[in-house]
Amino acid sequence: MDDHLLTAAEVADELRVSTMTIYRLIRSGELAAVRVGRNYRVRSSDLERYLSSQVVDPDSVDLSAMDDA
């Protein structure tokens, strides 16, 4: 089985976001997940699919609104 299952915490660590953010993405349907008992698991292929859908076209981003922090 090449498509391994990740916990919400593992996905959060990978994306450098909070676990709550991952749960919000799952509940909104933006990130596909499977339910195992009372817990959610994210297939590695679904995480890749989500990340591919989030790619930003640099020509469409207004960088003047960003801070120089």
Q: Which role fits each region the language model picked out?
A:
Residues 15-39:
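Major-groove DNA-recognition helix of helix-turn-helix-type DNA-binding domains
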